[in-house]
Protein backbone atom coordinates (compact mmCIF):
# COMPACT_ATOMS: atom_id res chain seq x y z
CA UNK A 1 0.00 0.00 0.00
CA UNK A 2 1.01 3.61 -0.58
CA UNK A 3 2.09 5.54 2.50
CA UNK A 4 -0.22 8.25 3.82
CA UNK A 5 0.91 11.82 3.36
CA UNK A 6 -0.24 15.11 4.76
CA UNK A 7 -0.34 18.40 2.93
CA UNK A 8 -0.62 22.00 4.03
CA UNK A 9 -3.91 23.68 4.74
CA UNK A 10 -5.64 24.80 1.53
CA UNK A 11 -6.82 28.40 1.45
CA UNK A 12 -9.73 29.07 -0.86
CA UNK A 13 -8.44 32.38 -2.17
CA UNK A 14 -10.67 32.90 -5.21
CA UNK A 15 -14.43 33.35 -5.35
CA UNK A 16 -16.94 33.69 -8.18
CA UNK A 17 -20.65 34.27 -7.43
CA UNK A 18 -23.00 31.53 -8.54
CA UNK A 19 -24.62 33.96 -11.01
CA UNK A 20 -21.34 34.03 -12.96
CA UNK A 21 -21.94 30.37 -13.83
CA UNK A 22 -25.28 31.02 -15.54
CA UNK A 23 -25.28 29.32 -18.93
CA UNK A 24 -28.78 30.02 -20.27
CA UNK A 25 -31.85 32.02 -19.26
CA UNK A 26 -35.50 31.47 -20.16
CA UNK A 27 -38.72 33.21 -19.26
CA UNK A 28 -41.13 31.01 -17.31
CA UNK A 29 -40.84 28.28 -14.70
CA UNK A 30 -38.84 25.39 -16.22
CA UNK A 31 -37.35 22.10 -15.03
CA UNK A 32 -33.75 21.06 -15.67
CA UNK A 33 -34.98 18.80 -18.46
CA UNK A 34 -36.94 21.56 -20.18
CA UNK A 35 -33.74 23.63 -20.12
CA UNK A 36 -31.68 20.68 -21.48
CA UNK A 37 -29.57 20.37 -18.33
CA UNK A 38 -28.91 16.97 -16.76
CA UNK A 39 -26.95 18.00 -13.67
CA UNK A 40 -26.28 21.21 -11.84
CA UNK A 41 -28.22 24.05 -10.28
CA UNK A 42 -31.12 26.19 -11.42
CA UNK A 43 -31.63 29.77 -10.25
CA UNK A 44 -35.25 30.89 -10.35
CA UNK A 45 -36.21 34.56 -9.99
CA UNK A 46 -39.65 36.09 -9.46
CA UNK A 47 -41.19 39.13 -7.80
CA UNK A 48 -43.56 38.20 -4.98
CA UNK A 49 -46.61 40.37 -4.25
CA UNK A 50 -46.93 42.47 -1.11
CA UNK A 51 -48.52 40.61 1.80
CA UNK A 52 -49.45 42.42 5.00
CA UNK A 53 -49.00 39.25 7.03
CA UNK A 54 -46.56 36.33 6.92
CA UNK A 55 -47.20 33.89 4.08
CA UNK A 56 -46.50 30.23 3.36
CA UNK A 57 -44.56 29.39 0.20
CA UNK A 58 -45.40 25.91 -1.11
CA UNK A 59 -43.57 24.10 -3.91
CA UNK A 60 -42.20 20.75 -5.00
CA UNK A 61 -38.45 21.33 -5.40
CA UNK A 62 -36.30 18.45 -6.68
CA UNK A 63 -34.00 18.04 -4.81
CA UNK A 64 -32.72 20.80 -2.51
CA UNK A 65 -33.83 24.45 -2.57
CA UNK A 66 -32.61 27.59 -0.82
CA UNK A 67 -35.09 30.48 -0.80
CA UNK A 68 -33.95 34.11 -0.66
CA UNK A 69 -36.41 36.99 -0.31
CA UNK A 70 -35.13 40.53 -0.58
CA UNK A 71 -31.57 39.16 -0.70
CA UNK A 72 -31.90 37.31 2.63
CA UNK A 73 -32.02 33.55 3.13
CA UNK A 74 -35.45 32.73 4.58
CA UNK A 75 -35.26 28.95 4.46
CA UNK A 76 -34.55 25.74 2.63
CA UNK A 77 -36.57 22.83 1.33
CA UNK A 78 -35.07 19.34 1.28
CA UNK A 79 -36.87 16.70 -0.77
CA UNK A 80 -35.25 13.86 1.22
CA UNK A 81 -37.06 15.23 4.30
CA UNK A 82 -40.32 15.73 2.37
CA UNK A 83 -40.16 19.51 2.97
CA UNK A 84 -42.53 21.34 0.63
CA UNK A 85 -43.36 24.63 2.36
CA UNK A 86 -41.81 27.36 4.43
CA UNK A 87 -42.91 30.49 6.23
CA UNK A 88 -42.07 33.85 4.67
CA UNK A 89 -42.14 37.14 6.55
CA UNK A 90 -44.73 39.78 5.70
CA UNK A 91 -43.80 41.59 2.50
CA UNK A 92 -44.87 45.23 2.62
CA UNK A 93 -43.98 45.85 -1.03
CA UNK A 94 -43.44 43.60 -4.06
CA UNK A 95 -40.16 41.82 -3.33
CA UNK A 96 -37.69 39.88 -5.47
CA UNK A 97 -37.30 36.21 -4.57
CA UNK A 98 -34.49 33.94 -5.71
CA UNK A 99 -34.82 30.17 -5.37
CA UNK A 100 -31.69 28.10 -5.93
CA UNK A 101 -32.48 24.44 -6.66
CA UNK A 102 -29.78 21.77 -6.75
CA UNK A 103 -30.32 18.38 -8.35
CA UNK A 104 -28.76 15.73 -6.09
CA UNK A 105 -28.47 12.80 -8.47
CA UNK A 106 -30.47 10.58 -10.78
CA UNK A 107 -32.14 7.19 -10.69
CA UNK A 108 -32.07 5.86 -14.23
CA UNK A 109 -34.35 2.85 -13.99
CA UNK A 110 -37.76 1.67 -12.81
CA UNK A 111 -40.53 3.96 -11.64
CA UNK A 112 -38.07 6.77 -10.83
CA UNK A 113 -36.88 7.05 -14.44
CA UNK A 114 -38.90 10.28 -14.82
CA UNK A 115 -37.40 11.99 -11.77
CA UNK A 116 -37.48 15.56 -13.07
CA UNK A 117 -35.25 18.16 -11.40
CA UNK A 118 -35.92 21.76 -10.47
CA UNK A 119 -39.27 23.23 -9.43
CA UNK A 120 -41.98 20.78 -10.43
CA UNK A 121 -45.45 22.22 -11.01
CA UNK A 122 -46.74 25.48 -9.59
CA UNK A 123 -45.64 27.50 -6.61
CA UNK A 124 -48.24 28.99 -4.30
CA UNK A 125 -47.96 31.79 -1.79
CA UNK A 126 -50.72 31.61 0.83
CA UNK A 127 -51.57 34.41 3.23
CA UNK A 128 -54.70 35.83 4.82
CA UNK A 129 -56.41 39.06 5.66
CA UNK A 130 -59.26 39.80 8.07
CA UNK A 131 -61.89 38.03 5.97
CA UNK A 132 -60.27 35.36 3.80
CA UNK A 133 -57.32 33.21 2.82
CA UNK A 134 -55.47 34.45 -0.26
CA UNK A 135 -53.54 32.17 -2.64
CA UNK A 136 -51.11 33.63 -5.17
CA UNK A 137 -49.41 31.78 -8.01
CA UNK A 138 -46.51 33.96 -9.22
CA UNK A 139 -46.19 33.81 -13.01
CA UNK A 140 -43.38 36.13 -14.12
CA UNK A 141 -40.52 33.63 -13.64
CA UNK A 142 -37.00 33.64 -14.97
CA UNK A 143 -35.17 30.27 -15.03
CA UNK A 144 -31.36 30.26 -15.21
CA UNK A 145 -29.20 27.15 -15.67
CA UNK A 146 -25.87 26.68 -13.90
CA UNK A 147 -24.38 23.42 -15.27
CA UNK A 148 -22.17 21.43 -12.92
CA UNK A 149 -19.09 21.18 -15.14
CA UNK A 150 -15.44 22.13 -14.79
CA UNK A 151 -15.66 24.23 -17.95
CA UNK A 152 -18.57 26.23 -16.54
CA UNK A 153 -16.65 26.86 -13.31
CA UNK A 154 -13.70 28.22 -15.31
CA UNK A 155 -16.07 30.53 -17.21
CA UNK A 156 -17.51 31.73 -13.90
CA UNK A 157 -14.06 32.72 -12.61
CA UNK A 158 -13.37 34.62 -15.84
CA UNK A 159 -16.68 36.51 -15.51
CA UNK A 160 -16.27 37.18 -11.78
CA UNK A 161 -13.84 40.09 -12.09
CA UNK A 162 -16.50 42.18 -13.86
CA UNK A 163 -19.43 41.01 -11.72
CA UNK A 164 -21.02 43.18 -9.06
CA UNK A 165 -23.30 41.00 -6.91
CA UNK A 166 -26.61 42.62 -6.05
CA UNK A 167 -27.77 40.11 -3.48
CA UNK A 168 -25.98 39.24 -0.28
CA UNK A 169 -25.11 35.59 -0.35
CA UNK A 170 -21.88 33.75 -0.95
CA UNK A 171 -23.20 30.81 -2.96
CA UNK A 172 -20.73 30.27 -5.72
CA UNK A 173 -17.42 28.86 -6.79
CA UNK A 174 -14.39 28.78 -4.50
CA UNK A 175 -10.87 27.92 -5.65
CA UNK A 176 -7.58 27.33 -3.89
CA UNK A 177 -4.22 25.82 -4.78
CA UNK A 178 -1.86 23.37 -3.12
CA UNK A 179 1.49 21.92 -4.18
CA UNK A 180 2.05 18.31 -3.22
CA UNK A 181 5.72 17.35 -3.35
CA UNK A 182 5.36 13.71 -2.42
CA UNK A 183 2.96 11.07 -3.71
CA UNK A 184 1.04 9.07 -1.16
List each language-model region with its residue ranges.
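An acidic-aromatic loop/edge-strand motif
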Residues: 1-9, 13-32, 92-183
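A cross-kingdom feature marking solvent-exposed beta-strand/loop segments within repeated
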Residues: 24, 28-34, 43, 52-54, ...
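Solvent-exposed, flexible loop/coil residues
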Residues: 36-39, 47
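Non-transmembrane functional regions of envelope-associated proteins
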Residues: 37, 68, 167
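Short solvent-exposed loop/turn micro-motifs enriched in small/polar/acidic residues
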Residues: 41, 58-60, 79-81, 171, ...
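Non-catalytic terminal accessory/regulatory regions of metabolic enzymes
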Residues: 44, 61, 74, 115-118, ...
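Conserved short histidine dyad/triad with adjacent acidic residue
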Residues: 45-51, 179
Amino acid sequence: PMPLISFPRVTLSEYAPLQCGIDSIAEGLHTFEEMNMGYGTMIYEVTLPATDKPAVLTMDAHDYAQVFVGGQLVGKLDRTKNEKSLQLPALYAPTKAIIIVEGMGRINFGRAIKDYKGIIGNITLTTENEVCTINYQPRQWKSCTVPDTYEQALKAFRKASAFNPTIGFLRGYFRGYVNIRKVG
